[in-house]
Amino acid sequence: MDLFDRINKLKEEGLNEIKQAENQKMLDKIRVELMGRKGELTEILHSMKDIAPENRPKVGQEVNQVRDLFQKQLDEAKNNFLQTLIAKKLEEEKIDVTLPGREGHLGSKHPINIILDDLESYFIGMGYEVVQGPEIETDHYVFEMMNLPKDHPARDMQATFYIDEENLLRTQTSGDQARVLEKHDFSKGPLKMVGPGKVYRRDDDDATHSHQFQQMEGLVIDKNVTMSDLKGTLEMIAKHVFGQDRKTRLRPSYFPFTEPSVEMDVSCFNCDGKGCPICKYTGWIEVLGAGMVHPNVLENAGVDSTVYGGFAFGLGLDRFAILKYGISDIRDFYTNDVRFLAQFRKEED
């Protein structure tokens, strides 16, 4: 068989193999066998040294024509495979535009955020400033500035997460009060602020306790602020959140940063003050603590306690939400159950 017969036979067999290829992988293998560095066309070119010089141009021309033909057929086959693949993918992933769209799920605010936003708006309307301090606080601001020096026995009331000897996760937002007191210029007017935020205590999580909860503390400092001002403010808060018919009472208590100190109760939501298991048959439920700011707290912040005085209060936003909405387990706030959260959508209006 001469070289021209070999070229023609290779052309016929090569075109047939390309035609019968079933996928791109087979096509790539055929390309290498026909046109690769060790392919059959390359071998023919290498064998041209054994033919007469006058025939070499013609053989080279034949080889190039066959190479171009192979390349054309390979490209066409590759394009066909690609089109088939695209068509298959479109068929598998097609969207029926006549189907109705999926209904969107309307979100809702978290019940604690509903309480928080409502109280912030309420206090802003009464001229209070909303202040937020750091959650990682210093012992100085959380305790010492609030009349709780080191080794004070009342520190045992606080189950604290200490980061190191000086820094801690705040157990209350009172540190915000101390920071504002230090900087406030009383020549420009009285101080009225609320400080909401997360606080942390080493409690075991159960239906009524959590190691993390949200608190809001309030502070009013001016000349001639009295206990009557505090009582009126607390009553307004209770009636705003729990309803105008809710009865309130103050009981003596103890907090290191206030003197005198009180706790406020509201009439039981379940029995309306008649007595039931929820209120332990007292007719009352505790909602917050408060008192007149201790002179030491003022002096620690550089405020003359003989000229200025005021009151402070602290309330648990989680507790307010539990009482207002009748929630039995505080853990419901943090389990992200959309069925639980959806029921508060109407409360946002």
From Swiss-Prot:
Database matches in InterPro entries: aa-tRNA-synth_II (IPR006195), aa-tRNA-synth_II/BPL/LPL (IPR045864), Phe-tRNA-synth_IIc_asu (IPR004529), Phe-tRNA_ligase_II_N (IPR004188), Phe_tRNA_ligase_alpha1_bac (IPR022911), Phenylalanyl-tRNA_Synthase (IPR002319), tRNA-bd_arm (IPR010978)
Enzyme class label: ligase
SUPFAM superfamilies given in the database record: Class II aaRS and biotin synthetases, tRNA-binding arm
EC number: 6.1.1.20
UniProt-annotated binding residues for Mg(2+): E259
Protein name (database record): Phenylalanine--tRNA ligase alpha subunit
Annotated source species: Lactobacillus johnsonii (strain CNCM I-12250 / La1 / NCC 533)
Cofactor(s) required, per the database record: Mg(2+)
BP-aspect Gene Ontology terms: phenylalanyl-tRNA aminoacylation
Keywords: Aminoacyl-tRNA synthetase, ATP-binding, Cytoplasm, Ligase, Magnesium, Metal-binding, Nucleotide-binding, Protein biosynthesis
Pfam families: Phe_tRNA-synt_N (PF02912), tRNA-synt_2d (PF01409)
UniProt similarity note: Belongs to the class-II aminoacyl-tRNA synthetase family. Phe-tRNA synthetase alpha subunit type 1 subfamily.
